[in-house]
Amino acid sequence: MKREKVTSLNGEIHIPGDKSISHRSVMFGALAEGTTTVKNFLPGADCLSTIACFRKMGVSIEQNGSDVTIYGKGIDALCEPDSLLDVGNSGTTIRLMLGILAGRPFHSTVAGDESIAKRPMKRVTEPLKQMGAAIDGRADGGFTPLSVRGGQLKGIDYVSPVASAQIKSAVLLAGLQAEGTTTVTEPHKSRDHTERMLNAFGAELAETETSASVTGGQKLRGADIFVPGDISSAAFFLAAGAVVPGSRIVLKNVGLNPTRTGMIDVLKQMGASLEVIPSEADSAEPYGDLVIETSALKAAEIGGEIIPRLIDEIPIIALLATQAEGTTVIKDAAELKVKETNRIDTVVSELRKIGADIEPTEDGMKIHGKKTLAGGADVSSHGDHRIGMMLGVASCLTEEPIDIRDTEAIHVSYPTFFEHLDQLAKKA
């Protein structure tokens, strides 16, 4: 896809529904008793994989664009799938679903695409095995395909080596089916969509700053869920609005969950002109409008506790840093190596192709700004949606057009991304 520089970006867009919350709304609706309705669901490939997997386990789900209805009959109504549960490209689907399958008295096999086959699963399968699930696969359950025989689980106190909402959620979902209480403790607080949604579906949890506990045997009740816009998708337009000259972009109804707003903190730290207008609506997840305008940016050091709050935004932050005065350092982000691609390598290689002064480090990267991006190169998403969208924003800045390969990857989380970008763009 050939893309060229724009003179400015102006207008208002509605960001598609949050991917993390969309996944969970379907899963919890499938486990609940009664009907669950979901508004502003994200109909991207990843979330559609979640729907397909639960349909295979006998759950009746109607999906019409961004409206979804799940006719739940309780967790005990899930039935043994008669074929492979295929998660496609979705790490959230496989890791959370493993927590559910761990407590079900049947056999299932779970796998996904080539990217999923490379992603580490032991971080989830190990605590589930400790609880009593039988899980096997390549490298002793470390990689897909995975075979799961669920059964009687016992609650555990699990100390996670990394702050990961996927690990925490998998163990808590298993804990709902276990005897006794299950507690997960993390080094820093990860995103808390699971805890908020369990509350919305009627479950009781005990929480501290870095831990969450559930007691087994609780029943979930169907709920009405509004999914706010995905801040990880909004991040691309926040960055674009900050660095493309003469821009002003309004993003409507974006999720403002404090465990996800690291991008907003970084933009403010870098000196961006950003206004946050919280919604007054009563909702399990806070949300509001964001207004971003072009401004001069300065470099920042990004690391420590903020990393779990912006791990998915690091590719676009790297691009942002090319347009900031000084050297930006991103550290404590080794988790990037086990995303859809090794995002340290792919961000560095693709941004270098278009003229960025960027170098990889063991746990992040250093970006030297402010730099004019020459462009005039062939670049690729490497099958990673967030790299594809980062390059889409980069094309607005490059002196010469760039040709972006493998743009279909963006359908995972933001099928209308380029449509929205073109809607805002004033061409040179």
Curated annotation (Swiss-Prot):
HAMAP family: EPSP_synth (MF_00210). Pathway: Metabolic intermediate biosynthesis; chorismate biosynthesis; chorismate from D-erythrose 4-phosphate and phosphoenolpyruvate: step 6/7. Belongs to the EPSP synthase family. Phosphoenolpyruvate binds at residues 19, 91, 119, 166, 343, 386. This is 3-phosphoshikimate 1-carboxyvinyltransferase. It is found in: Cytoplasm. The keyword Protein biosynthesis does not apply. The active site is at 312 (proton acceptor). One of its GO terms (cellular component) is cytoplasm. GO terms for molecular function: 3-phosphoshikimate 1-carboxyvinyltransferase activity. NCBIfam families: aroA. Monomer. The gene is aroA.
